[in-house]
């Protein structure tokens, strides 16, 4: 058991640390703080903890006579740390008669400690306070040092005081009930204090990390009985005693550091700001990522960034940065904001560079505008005794993954530098394998600290191959080898990132691993690129030798499963080694442990990179095993049985491949660089680079046995290398390429060509490096030629010819392909661009993407380039053009035969303006036009599936980001490889859309279709097998019912077009900004309600599907309901709601599996809104938020029981929870017990305006709250069987009540012009007003005088609400408008007058909307970019028609007219981007290649068509036959109902025709919505206008 410890601070032993010290706690307070009143303050969460209850009871029992104990409980969370809570507590203390001798006891985390401490500092001008911290963060940080504060709306901790507590009583036992994430969160501060002050404690923390995480991850929820209330509570419970000694020490040591620092600098003038290590950057992240990210998590990221800043300055060694990063990860903390789990936790919030810097400028350490950061010198020590000044330039570099390399202009020619690259990756990985297999202790020095070796060390540890520890402040790794005897299978897959070396070496090592009782295999896996890299030759050899290995994904690549109950037999092993020498080294190193001596024969041709094989053999010799090379058989080795004996020390040579970069820097800049620990005795082939490549190019080389010095010639005088075989140093070819790019000679016939061969293996490295170099060099203006096993680089004649990589939109980044060697090579060439320009000339830097990929072999490369070699670097926000946008991500459509894939694929391509490829047709093209059916007959289904998969992977690889729609065969999901490709595409942001329909109808259809290859089995069986696969592979889903009539078909097309536009983000989902409503459906099945759905939705911006009311929750049924609703309501936005029973609905409270499935259906169906209850489990909430795509989330909370008044903290906490989840809309529903509840609600609404808020009260007493709610008020309809909640009103009822309260002023609106006797406008508008309960009146004002309109209406009618303008006033009225919309300006006429207030008016034109919306409503897609348009006539309406067709995206618009002379002035008066072409002769129409699919007739309808105009029209109508949709003509005239143009278009050319009455109604509806702000009841209005 641990001892009670006392830690002095400011000269007093007031910090007490122990375990289970409640007796001591009570005794200390009562004995040393005598008082008449003790006040224990805590939050409601702590009240549930039995240890707290025990403490309170004991405190009461121990009170001396004359003393009393008060308890005050607040709501948990940061929101309680406010002025309001402070005032409430102070009022309570005053009411209770507390005086100056009061002792406040703050029991809780940082919120309680900060707030109660501040109350104590001000109450009665200061009373005593005792801090009893219960969270790890509070124990080691906030309770120590006397800082107290509350938050304000403008920021955290802005109001407070330094008020030292009388005691800080730290009882480790409180941590038993601390939630896992909070526990880990507190470790950030613990690690920080060790990092800045106590190296020994840091080392101790390192060695206990796995114990800590195992215990904390083992926390369980337990039910306990509350000793104070007898209620049953559920709390978290961690077995602290399992790591008591470790926990006690980490708390105590961290407190000691903070106490010592505070004692030296109480008011934070200098030394105390060292405690802010990690906080300058961490706080900036926290400001953006709060409240999703916790303080400690952001400080953890900040510590890594600030440590990298120190390394960038050349102060902190790379090893120390690696140690810090590793320990943070080991304790479960994030080290980058881009970690997948952390991004999901923070809801994928972005952390823009400019915002981070802005947040960093608000830091108490700063001096004015100068930023200060704590700089680490080594683990346990800071640089200086306070924070240091840093520039924004350096911070930008550290905070981003995109680097700007400026020209190497200011580097003196006589510069001489010594650079020591990190340890060799090749030697490091080999040394770790050999030492782990060896016996005894081996101290490995200069080990490369990189991603690769980190994965290798982790694997050796997980497989229990050796005991690993660190010395020399982490610079030396100590491997205690166990001779291979302890190697044991681990349950978790070994993740190796993109570490090719580690993956190859560990594959053979896996063959030596022993099974455990519970584990008979191990799995090796890696990132996406690692899962493409080859490993087959090695696996084939091991399999042939008795090791059982399975591929888990792609044949020939990771992930693999290696069975540990098979044996590594030994004997003769044949291995193909033409792809990678690592296969050879892998078997060589493990061969001594085979059952028999090994003869390893390399077959299939000359092995690649034989020098690396020689390296392995030499290293094996150092560890005690001698390999014999055959004298009779080429490329054959004999390896005896035996055990490695570890040397006591092994020093890793620096990486020769990495050394090529500083040496090439010297060559390119004409300076001198020495690498002091690589010479001609090196084990590594790349050590030849200076001698074999740079020397013949013109450099001076000095090489000893152990060092290499390169002095470059004058800048611009490097010579090309006619030919070099780089097979001994293949990794260095990339460096050679960038040197060759600026090499030239005087021979005019040479083309400055450098030829590099022997590097075929570089195509299967981290990327295809030969292709990568060719692609990226081209961006600099350097030409290359790819060779079968190499590359030719054609150098530029002058360095001045180097270009800044750019395209038509400006500079672009150099892609690094997540490959460290590509990044480092181009960092050199980037600095040469513009390096020879005049010194004062402003130069554009070159942008390098993904700079962090150099972490694989040289994490500190950029630091060396900057601090050692003198390069100027900066960081930058990713370019918009370089970030991956989903706007052009292709769409893959999957589904059963006869699901409508062919038709809907065409619609999809048309709606998005994408290209369409039918994969079955592509298959036939690639197989000599042989049909799929014939191919299957001749070759079988299996062969067809292989070909289908190949083609699919090919098109996705080549065109997945280029805006295509791929229609697939129904069986594409039958192949596991295709399924993986589909899922990979979906996870990369692509759209995989599952199209489905009623299976019964599909079966009937398929059985009658002879054109398709026959199914071998029953269709239903096929569906049952594939259904799960379709769902698994798709990220979107659309239910497409069979259509029996053309109107249904058009409705489905409109529905699909809006759906695809929504899920791809083309159509933005808007949250209404003004008064708006949604209707709540309560049907159990919508199938029989289709006729009523439109009128039910009148006046609403959205419709809510109460899924909990539906008859069943199956995926098909729910999808079908959504489809019915979309078709019936013309895709009014859907709110998808599953209301649980405890929130007032029908859905079972604990059916979380079904609930998840329903939310998945909603998101795949692209619903516009999803209602997410704030009482649901957090993991469900985060899952939905992270998968929401373009769907808006409504965070809802309902109080059906009326438990909470609107001034209760419950609503405040729920609102903050909604902010934490970053929902789009908050919906709160309370219960009005009395009328005053509505007033309290309005106060809440008025003080919570930072998110759209729906807030209403239920019951009839709450009706007024529904009237006063602004955004998306839930309403019912007279056509519904019942309302969804007590007190719901209809839209009309709300509007009438709001009018009676003065909320809506009655307006008078008019149609103006002459003649208007037959105008349908009054009927149109008054019908809408009546249905929606609006108080307005629409009448006629007949006149030919615009002046009279101004006098009588604009100026003379104080209730004027707007005017519909008709002939002859559309032009005359414009002079009286204060503003004109773009439409009115371009069309040149006003048909709508909108009052702006203060006697100001805006002129608009809705004729174009009437035309556009009438066309869309009749099946024309919203985007018709692949189709041309036609306008007939050149009068006033034709301008609106041209405007409408342009808005639809017509790439060309043809116009014909009886009088052709009128065309030219009309065309010239409109914008050139409309691309209008006037047709003067019939002959010119024959030459038009475009399909014409949409037309508008604007000629008088009461006269026959002119013969020539008719001839032109008919020639255009012929061109509609090939449009991507049913060609459609709109007649602008609405009398007569059928015109000559309509007749000829429909009867002779089968065009779909739209009568003018529809245009009339649509333009009127547009006016209605502009004047009233309400969505018009279209169907009712249309029926009223056209019923005559």
Swiss-Prot record:
Zn(2+) binds at residues 189, 279, 295. This is Pentafunctional AROM polypeptide. Keywords: Amino-acid biosynthesis, Aromatic amino acid biosynthesis, ATP-binding, Cytoplasm, Kinase, Lyase, Metal-binding, Multifunctional enzyme, NADP, Nucleotide-binding, Oxidoreductase, Transferase, Zinc. Residues 405-871 are annotated as: EPSP synthase. GO terms for biological process: amino acid biosynthetic process; aromatic amino acid family biosynthetic process; chorismate biosynthetic process. The active site is at 268 (proton acceptor), 283 (proton acceptor), 853 (for epsp synthase activity), 1198 (proton acceptor), 1227 (schiff-base intermediate with substrate). It comes from Saccharomyces cerevisiae (strain YJM789). It holds the Pfam family DHQS_C. NAD(+) binds at residues 43-45, 78-81, 109-111, 114, 134-135, 156, 174-177, 185. InterPro entries: 3-dehydroquinate_DH_AS, Aldolase_TIM, Aminoacid_DH-like_N_sf, DHQ_synth_AroB, DHQS/DOIS_N, DHQS_C, DHquinase_I, Enolpyruvate_Tfrase_dom. The AROM polypeptide catalyzes 5 consecutive enzymatic reactions in prechorismate polyaromatic amino acid biosynthesis. 7-phospho-2-dehydro-3-deoxy-D-arabino-heptonate binds at residues 125, 141, 147, 157, 189-192, 258, 272-276, 279, 295, 364. GO terms for molecular function: 3-dehydroquinate dehydratase activity; 3-dehydroquinate synthase activity; 3-phosphoshikimate 1-carboxyvinyltransferase activity; ATP binding; metal ion binding; shikimate 3-dehydrogenase (NADP+) activity; shikimate kinase activity. Its EC number is 4.2.3.4, 2.5.1.19, 2.7.1.71, 4.2.1.10. Homodimer. ATP binds at residues 895-902.
